[in-house]
Amino acid sequence: MKYMVTWTISPANYKAAVERFLETGAPAPKGMKTLGRWHTAGSSRGFHLVEGSDAALAELNAEWADLLDLQAVPVVEDDVAGAVAKKILAKK
């Protein structure tokens, strides 16, 4: 499954979060692949598109939960969303 993980860093945790990121590179845990990661310029917000198991997602979030406010939502591509929408509309 693919997930979009978003984060915000509180001002109190900003320095520690940046230091950890620079030291580790924030690799995805085993069972998870990073598809893309974006940082909003000039702010403490970012986006991490990953693919993997629920367990790997839980591990990823646990690794950063002490410094970041994290949210993860499952996401699908247009072709999957379109097929589901077509199926639902056909029932109505």
Predicted feature locations:
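A common structural junction motif
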Residues: 25-26, 64-72
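Short amphipathic alpha-helices within nucleic acid-binding modules
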Residues: 54-62
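A common structural microfeature
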Residues: 45-47, 69
